[in-house]
């Protein structure tokens, strides 16, 4: 899938056009200008001008070619707007906007002119592949065929490939053009437009090396700062900053570094720079990973294995380990018998390590004739039969010659023992595989594996011969019965190639005359695949931060195998339990992860990796990778609800627990630590960060405010910190904490004149009270609890409305002051609250002496309190509480509270309006307003208004 990270707006970023000389018929922008009255007067002249120059201008228009340039990113989806030819050619005013493709372009309308234009490609060609042209609006869009800049414009193409009306132009620079020829019709507005669309490159290709293994040879005598070009540099089809920008080594070994040089064409070549002195004899090879990185955002990487070989120079000469050897030769030795061998060592390689052996010029010719020196192997053999005149001692000076070196010198002192009798003979018969005197054994051969039979005999047949095994090694030489003088050489314990690869022992025989003979046996062990690869650590513990970049490096696995050659070559593989997005390079052991890891999705990964050698059969070992994804602060605190609602009874004590605000943060450690705070209303509410408990600092009164809306912010402890908010709604539930407030009558000292002619059943006055509570706490009942007067039982009060009516016809004896003590009680639970008010009714025809009435009102009445509950048809609310959930009741009370507030407000407005309509008349009841005192005080002297008190 092609990346679209750099895709920008569909609007073309650059537009340039080159029109010919302006002509009134072709410049549509001029036709939209408002005409003045003068232009109408010049119409005849303008008509003649058009008639004369029109044909020439038409011919001129065919010769005009307009060029437009647009640019867009490669890889855009279908339907992205590239540009509008009509607007960019100024065939339509830009303020007019784009025409509706379904609508007909208007003809001449008054002073404006919109020509019916059409747009088409000169020929189809490849146009349907990459762009589409709207024939009416002239809008260019991308087609369903995705534009791939790397496929269209091959670097270095240098030219233009035409196909019909669409062509591809590329050059060694990073420009890539899509060329189109567009015709604008009808003929009288004809234009031939060349459209160039520059395709901008996006970083959709990673650098890639042509080969996975790159080898560089460096002479071991290369001085510091030697620069060596690395062949096969990485290739990136992208251009510009998206191409290869830099190279780096994953492991420098302290000996090398990389530099990048750029040539005139912008090509970057990596150079290997020597940083220290090299010695092939110390280390002949360095292996590292070379990484190529482009300049995109984010950058893409490519890698290959870089093997740096150290080539040999002739900086070492042959050396002998000893300066002198002593050799004994018996006079009866057979011609051609090797008597000794010298060997020098040269640490160089190839021709630099070739050694030839020769005698020094000081060696006498007689010694040279008696002993032959092989110039290639250094073996000294008896060249002629030892005669009686041969010297008993010879000094052989041998030179080891290397190219360009001073010869190394060793001296062989040869002593000749002249004998009359022949020494014992040792005749071997090999059972194991023997080549050129070397026996080859597999390391896994069992104990007591036979190697060879040896026959020990005296050539003269006169002397007894004994033998033994000389040398160290897991071998045993024992007589092989029932045969005499037959001996078997066999192994005594298992052999391990990894501990010792080569053994040298000798079978020594001697007779009773003291003659000794030995036969050297060389044993070379052959390696078996008996060792499995071993990881340095059986448990590989790794860490990586979440939201890592793709193909992030985790570690480089390393396992050793003690076996040799291909049996010791190790390849690395992921175990079957490893997730698919982990990758392991089988050669280098580099472990990477191809995708971003999310700690909140999975924090720990545990899977196996295998190290397998190339033996037959292969052996393997397993290690466990334990990867821990480290946390980043990439998650905001999250409330369990977006909105929280709490129902709290009013008068709730300060710092009481209202409710718990639950919030979580998927991050870990400090990134997941959340602090809560109240954003608004912080002067009233506070929240406990540790528990998330919301508390009110003060007691809440529903009558002052029935609900609160506040916002709580949760902030984590990351850097930078992340936050989120939640809405908290607190609804106060009403409790019966307000007694009814009597609004009328306004004073215990007020009275009302009742005419004796008032008919029974007629309303006389009313008691009106309100309660600030809601629900049943605000339902008011009225009752008369005390009476005083001539016949005060003549009046009754409606328990629901508080209306006081006349029960019986008034008699002559009923004249005077009637005093009714009215109790106004709510239906609160568990304890109803109430207030009282004194209603004074003066029965008389007129009020002739107000001072007399006032004196009566000042006297404290002797009233017997009647504790009668008013009988009103209200459903009982204070029933026995059942063990059910309180939530439905709380919700219902909240609804009733809100409704009651609305009802009380409406009633207050109604009373105010009603009082405004009342006008006192002479024939109506006379009401005298007397100040109210806190308690029932009939001896008031001051007319100071006060509230009615609770009893």
UniProtKB/Swiss-Prot annotation:
Residue ranges, Cytoplasmic side: 912-951
Keyword Hydrolase: no
Location, primary (coarse class): membrane
Cited InterPro entries: Cadherin-like_dom, Cadherin-like_sf, Cadherin_CS, Protocadherin/Cadherin-CA
GO cellular component labels: plasma membrane
Protein's membrane topology: Single-pass type I membrane protein
Domain Cadherin: 64-209, 210-320, 321-535, 536-639, 640-742, 746-863
Signal sequence segment: 1-60
Residue positions with a glycan: 135, 326, 332, 680, 748, 803, 844, 849
GO biological process: cell adhesion; homophilic cell adhesion via plasma membrane adhesion molecules
Chain ranges passing through the membrane: 891-911
Extracellular side of membrane: 61-890
Superkingdom of origin: Eukaryota
Subcellular location: Cell membrane
Annotated keywords: Calcium, Cell adhesion, Cell membrane, Glycoprotein, Membrane, Repeat, Signal, Transmembrane, Transmembrane helix
Molecular function via GO: calcium ion binding; RNA binding
Pfam family, one: Cadherin
Role description: Potential calcium-dependent cell-adhesion protein.
PANTHER family in the cross-refs: CADHERIN-87A (PTHR24028), PROTOCADHERIN-20 (PTHR24028:SF260)
Protein name: Protocadherin-20
Organism: Homo sapiens
């Amino acid at each position: 899938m092609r990346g679209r990270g750099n895709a920008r707006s569909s609007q073309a970023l650059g537009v340039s056009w080159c029109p010919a000389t302006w002509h009134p018929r072709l410049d549509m922008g001029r036709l939209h200008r408002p005409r003045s009255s003068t232009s109408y007067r010049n119409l005849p002249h303008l008509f003649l001008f058009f008639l004369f120059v029109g044909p020439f201008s038409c011919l001129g228009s065919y010769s005009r070619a307009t060029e437009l340039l647009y640019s867009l990113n490669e890889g855009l989806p279908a339907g992205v707007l590239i540009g509008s030819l009509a607007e960019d050619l100024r065939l339509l005013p830009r303020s007019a906007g784009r025409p509706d493709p379904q609508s007909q372009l208007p003809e001449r309308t008054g002073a404006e002119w919109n020509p019916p234009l059409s747009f088409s490609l000169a020929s189809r060609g490849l146009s349907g592949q990459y762009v589409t042209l709207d024939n009416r609006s002239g809008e260019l869009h991308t087609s369903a065929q995705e534009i791939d800049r790397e496929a269209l414009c091959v670097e270095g193409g240098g030219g233009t490939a035409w196909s019909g009306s669409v062509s591809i132009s590329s050059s060694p620079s990073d420009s890539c053009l899509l060329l189109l020829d567009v015709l604008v019709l009808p003929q009288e507005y004809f234009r031939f437009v060349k459209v160039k669309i520059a395709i901008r490159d996006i970083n959709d290709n990673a650098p890639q090396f042509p080969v996975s293994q790159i080898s560089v040879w460096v002479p071991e005598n290369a001085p510091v700062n030697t620069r060596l070009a690395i062949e096969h540099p990485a290739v990136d089809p992208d251009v510009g900053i998206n191409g290869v920008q830099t190279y780096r080594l994953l492991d420098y070994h302290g000996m090398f570094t990389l530099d990048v040089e750029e040539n005139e064409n912008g090509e970057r070549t990596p150079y290997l720079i020597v940083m220290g002195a090299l010695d092939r004899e110390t280390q002949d090879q360095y292996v590292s990973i070379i990484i190529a990185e482009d300049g995109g955002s984010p950058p893409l990487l490519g890698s290959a294995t870089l093997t740096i070989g150290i080539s040999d120079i002739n900086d070492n000469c042959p050396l002998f380990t000893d300066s002198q050897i002593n050799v004994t030769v018996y006079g009866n030795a057979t011609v051609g018998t090797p008597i000794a061998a010298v060997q020098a060592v040269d640490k160089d390689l190839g021709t630099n390590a070739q050694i030839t052996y020769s005698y020094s010029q000081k060696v006498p010719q007689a010694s040279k004739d008696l002993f032959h020196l092989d110039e290639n192997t250094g073996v000294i053999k008896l060249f002629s039969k030892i005669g009686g005149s041969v010297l008993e001692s010879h000094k052989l000076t041998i030179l080891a010659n290397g190219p360009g070196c001073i010869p190394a010198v060793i001296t062989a002192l040869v002593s000749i023992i002249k004998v009359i009798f022949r020494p014992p003979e040792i005749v071997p018969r090999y059972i194991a595989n023997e080549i050129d005197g070397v026996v080859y054994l597999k390391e896994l051969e069992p104990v007591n594996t036979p190697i060879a039979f040896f026959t020990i005999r005296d050539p003269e047949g006169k002397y007894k011969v004994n033998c033994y095994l000389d040398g160290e090694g897991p071998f045993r030489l024992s007589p092989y019965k029932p045969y005499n003088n037959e001996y078997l050489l066999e192994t005594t314990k298992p052999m391990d190639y990894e501990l010792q690869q080569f053994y040298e022992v000798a079978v020594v025989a001697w007779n009773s005359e003291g003659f000794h003979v030995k036969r050297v046996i060389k044993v070379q062990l052959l390696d078996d695949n008996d060792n499995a690869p071993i990881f340095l650590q059986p448990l590989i513990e790794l860490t990586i931060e979440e939201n890592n970049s793709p193909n992030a490096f985790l570690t480089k696995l390393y396992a050793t195998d003690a076996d040799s050659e291909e049996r010791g070559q190790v390849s690395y593989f992921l175990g079957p339990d490893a997730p698919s997005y982990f990758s392991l390079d089988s050669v280098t052991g580099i472990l990477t992860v191809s995708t971003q890891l999310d700690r909140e999705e999975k924090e720990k990964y545990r899977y196996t990796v295998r190290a397998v050698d190339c033996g037959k059969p292969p052996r393997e070992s397993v290690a466990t990778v334990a990867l821990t994804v480290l946390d980043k602060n990439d998650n905001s605190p999250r409330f369990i609800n977006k909105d929280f609602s709490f129902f709290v009874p009013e008068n709730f004590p300060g710092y009481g627990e209202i409710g718990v605000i639950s919030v979580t943060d998927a991050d870990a450690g400090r990134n997941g630590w959340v602090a809560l705070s109240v954003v608004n209303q912080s002067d009233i509410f506070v929240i406990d960060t540790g528990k998330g408990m919301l508390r009110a600092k003060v007691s809440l009164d529903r009558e002052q405010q029935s609900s609160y809306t506040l916002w709580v912010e949760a902030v984590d402890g990351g850097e930078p910190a992340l936050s989120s908010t939640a809405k908290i709604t607190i609804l106060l539930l009403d409790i019966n904490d307000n007694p009814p407030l009597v609004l009328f009558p306004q004073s215990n000292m007020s009275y009302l004149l009742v005419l004796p002619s008032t008919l029974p059943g007629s309303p006389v006055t009313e008691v009106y009270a309100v309660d600030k509570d809601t629900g049943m706490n605000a339902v008011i009942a009225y009752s008369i609890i005390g009476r005083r007067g001539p016949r005060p039982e003549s009046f009754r009060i409606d328990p629901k409305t508080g209306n006081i009516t006349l029960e019986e016809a008034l008699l002559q004896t009923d004249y005077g002051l009637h005093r009714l003590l009215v109790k106004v009680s709510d239906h609160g639970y568990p304890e109803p609250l109430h207030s009282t008010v004194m209603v004074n009714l003066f029965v008389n025809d007129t009020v002739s002496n107000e001072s007399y009435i006032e004196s009566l009102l000042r006297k404290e009445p002797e009233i017997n309190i009647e504790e009668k509950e008013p009988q009103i048809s209200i459903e009982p609310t204070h029933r026995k509480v059942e063990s059910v959930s309180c939530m439905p009741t709380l919700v219902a009370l909240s609804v009733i509270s809100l409704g009651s507030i609305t009802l009380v407000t409406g009633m207050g407005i109604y009373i105010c309006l009603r009082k405004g309509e009342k006008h006192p008349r002479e024939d109506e009841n006379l009401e005298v307003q007397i100040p109210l005192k806190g308690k029932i005080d009939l001896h008031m002297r001051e007319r100071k208004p006060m509230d009615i008190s609770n009893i």
